[in-house]
Amino acid sequence: MLVISANEQRKLVNMNEVIAYAALALQEFSAERTITPIRTSLPFANEQNTALIMPSVAEGLEALGLKVVTVVPENKKIGKKTINGIVMLSDFQTGEPLALLEGSYLTMIRTGALSGVATKHLARHNAKTLCIIGTGEQAKGIAEAVFAVRDIEKVMLYNRTEEKAYAFAQYIQEKFGKPAYVYANANEAISEADIIVTTTNASTPVFSEKLQKGVHINAVGSFRPNMQELPSHAIANANKVVVESKEAALEETGDLQVPVREGLFEASDIHAELGQIISGEKAGRESDEEITVFKSVGLAVVDIIVAKYLYEKAVERGVGERIEF
């Protein structure tokens, strides 16, 4: 079995390739060619902490694996990662364990890739400005993916802890060579954005202003019913709300459950799963005036396909450590 660390994965990753593999996984899922149960969510130690268990099989892509990840928001106060995890990949024919991959970095790039796919199909082609609300680790992968699919010229940042936003602004300037500005108010930060990303653990909406026409949102932070990043009017007034899995999104996120409860949105109002747009079964953006929302809660099959991509690259390049059971 091959063990692949976060640093080793970092050297293997090409974001455009990861975006392509994520799109393939989404398409297989929406065509009902995978077995991807709704993940098991286990609270532990306190009500904020969550352990997530996510298996998946993708027959057509010959992939079998399991992801286990923990989310501990308070870890940031003691200088530790808030997301920790592992992904186990098994041989599709024999069931033997093939690889064990560090899971927090993989989660970051897969989360980014999902937003990259959504941005490619749902943001305006001429989108130039990106607003990121929440500047933790997950935001790095999303920024990289959005930059990969759109010609971003300016980035606006908002974070509850301003120092982290300034550090992220420096990261943007160094990695992408584009100006990044920190705002003290989230409503001001979104005011001139073509693309908005929310990646927080907020339980109440992170902005309140009405959205401008033509904007696209990637909302990735809320993965539990008691978490809500988007104001209900953002969901209710969107022309298209898109998800990875309708069943999972409706069961798992307050971003949809709250507006449904308030009578502002119905399950049938979800425009499409992202895989249906990739395949051409449903339309993506159809005009520059549309407001589009991608509400992401993650999808195990994408993790497993990205893990397989990393495993195959690692084998090809002789990266990782072989261990015997």
UniProtKB/Swiss-Prot annotation:
Top-level class of the enzyme under EC nomenclature:
oxidoreductase
Spell out the InterPro entries in the cross-references. NAD(P)-bd_dom_sf, ODC_Mu_crystall, ODC_N
As recorded in UniProt, its EC number(s) are 1.5.1.49
Q: Record keywords: Transferase included?
A: no
| Catalytic activity entry | L-proline + NAD(+) = 1-pyrroline-2-carboxylate + NADH + H(+); L-proline + NADP(+) = 1-pyrroline-2-carboxylate + NADPH + H(+)
- Any one of the GO CC terms: cytoplasm
The organism's superkingdom is given as: Bacteria
Which Pfam family is one of those matched by this entry?
A: OCD_Mu_crystall
Keywords (alphabetical) are: NAD, NADP, Oxidoreductase
Which terms in the Gene Ontology molecular function aspect does this entry carry?
oxidoreductase activity
Write down the PANTHER family for this protein, in alphabetical order.
Answer: KETIMINE REDUCTASE MU-CRYSTALLIN
Function text: Catalyzes the reduction of Delta(1)-pyrroline-2-carboxylate (Pyr2C) to L-proline, using preferentially NADPH over NADH as the electron donor. May be involved in a degradation pathway that converts trans-3-hydroxy-L-proline (t3LHyp) to L-proline.
Q: What family classification does the UniProt entry report for this protein?
A: Belongs to the ornithine cyclodeaminase/mu-crystallin family.
Spell out the protein name for this chain.
Delta(1)-pyrroline-2-carboxylate reductase
Give the species this sequence originates from. Bacillus cereus (strain ZK / E33L)
- Gene symbol? arcB
